[in-house]
Amino acid sequence: MKQMSYVTRWLYSTSHKDIGMTYLGFGMLSAMMGTGMSVMMRMELSNGNSQFFHGNNQAFNVMMSGHALLMMFFFIMPVWMGAFGNFFLPMLMGAADMAFARLNNISFWCLPPALVCMVCSVLMEQGAGTGFTTYPPLSSMSAHSGPSVDLAMFAMHLTSMSSLLGAMNFMVTVLNMRTMGLHMVNMPLFAWAMFLTAMLLLLSLPVLTAAVTLLLMDRNFNTGFYEVGAGGDPVTYEHLFWFFGHPEVYILMMPGFGVMSHMVSTYSKKPMFGEMGMLYAMGSIGFLGFLVWSHHMFVVGLDIDSRAYFTSATMVIAVPTGIKIFSWLATIYGGELRLGVPMLFALGFLFLFTMGGLTGVMTSNASMDVAFHDRIFIYYVSFFLYTLYNMYNNYTNNNTAHKGRHCANASYNNDINNLVSFMDKNEYIKMFWVGLMDGDGSMQVNHWRKKNLQYRLIMKTSNLESNYNMLMLMAKVMGGTVRISKKKDNVMWVVDSKESIKDMMKMFDKYPLLTSRKMCQINFMKKCMKLNYMPAEGGYPREAGTDWYLLNRNYKYNDQLNMINTFNLKLKNKSFMNALPEGHGMHHMVKHSEYFKCWLSGFMEAEGCFSIRLNKSNSFSMGQNDDFYLMEEIKQFFNATNSVRNSYKNFYCLEIYKRIMLNNIITHCSNYPLLGEKKESLMKFLK
């Protein structure tokens, strides 16, 4: 098959990720244009006299109209819905792509001609200086007789078509493309936000299209829908425009609500507080958004009953909005807060969104609007920009990878770069590797003809593609080589370089092994290396290491047995943690809980087992020889009520089957991901 060219890939792409990136690039181009117009307005207003337009007020109005339309229809909507929605929604749903891949491509290619029309409307003749609302009679032939307003209307038609096609695609994807076992109520909040936004688009955009079409007919076909002299009414246009215009505010904000929830949950390391409440709040905001449009029209001559209704309905929206704000604050409260750059933006958004909402209290009051008339635009712009601009900062500084329980089965399709956002990727892999070494690893010291000692670190797993990829990731960070055994039944990670092993010994001091057997192995190896490679420091002859090895190689686990026996005696009279042997790695684990969580994921990859029983119930089990105290600590970490049982000789097993405790395990694996075969087992387990 002929390889697709670079140009063909981007022009004819049906990949949701490629299309998402084209949306992003298009949005950035539009943002630069809109920002340029904003700079021109700022320069003009920087001094009391005319600075830039030399008294040409029409040019200023054209810049303001172009800026608003570009930023809303060509920047915010394509970037938030098109780019982030297309890129992340299929992954969150566990789907291979969007439901209608070619329709997805068409919805994007409606935008470039729309942008051309929009730019031409600014540049041709006197420009479209109508404001972004394009109210008649200011937008009628009597005020703007050139083609500029017509081109702006065509641009809005094309963007509406693009958004409608995208909205249908999003809704069908959410309804029909969810992975097995992912019910609607268990979807991530970002997926719900995109679904509700698509519903708002589908219900509101046809009304805008109708209003704009009637305006075009008035301008070009001599109709009189909005012409007072012909029996029409310009207020009709206002009702139609704002029936779209107010849901449009929530169309622009709703995806940010979903992202904000994921961001706060991730950087607080807690599940979202009141997740169902957040879902109902978003639904309520979307529903109420269709019932309050005339609060933009308080001074056009509404009767007092209508003004009273729209004032009351507008204030009711504050209730679900307050629920969302307090749920975000409750999630942050008591969490392990990490103030990364995205979280700083999230905290800034919380403050600015609250301030912007307070301006909405003033603009919702019909009585105050009469006094604020001619100044209401200032309040409206402050409300609009406080909320949207800072939510966009939030959006662009978040990686959107949700760490919650409900999207674990879908987000596991992402790689380690997306999943581990709260720490350095390499550090996570190192801590994960230590846990994997505790379970599947081996530290070997051998001799060659009783003269030279040879050292090796080996990790052996079953020969599966997922395990091979995991060990290749380990080798990339830790060094070493990955090879497949002669019988093709195992894949191994091996390090036999003395210098590399010395470096790893230092890393084990930072991230200690926690199982008794591996602790004894590393102590034995360190002793041999000290005697063999550091004779000058220790005052030992070079052959001392080999002699000591030959003398003690058959007794290297005696320390482990003594450690366990001592621990069991102490446990009768002391608390669990106080009974631990002196210097044991569990003391480090308590001091560095973040390390233990990462280590535990590696240990679960090696020793854990996700099972589906014959009665269709789920369970998780893991065990370890001799290390009762370690299994007891893991039990306490997951808040498990099951006892650690001695199933065979000194093999201690922990089995968890209650749903609440299983949820704790799933949440842990979402935050600290498994990387190999157990990752696939967990995905099947969730289905």
From Swiss-Prot:
A GO molecular-function annotation: heme binding
Mode of membrane association: Multi-pass membrane protein
Location of region: COX1 exons 1 to 3 encoded: 1-374
Membrane-traversing stretches: 19-39, 69-89, 103-123, 152-172, 188-208, 240-260, 273-293, 315-335, 341-361, 376-396
Keywords annotated in UniProt: Endonuclease, Hydrolase, Intron homing, Membrane, Mitochondrion, Nuclease, Transmembrane, Transmembrane helix
GO cellular component, one term: membrane
Subcellular location: Mitochondrion; Membrane
Protein name per UniProt: Probable intron-encoded endonuclease aI3
Naturally occurring in which organism (per UniProt): Debaryomyces hansenii (strain ATCC 36239 / CBS 767 / BCRC 21394 / JCM 1990 / NBRC 0083 / IGC 2968)
Gene: aI3
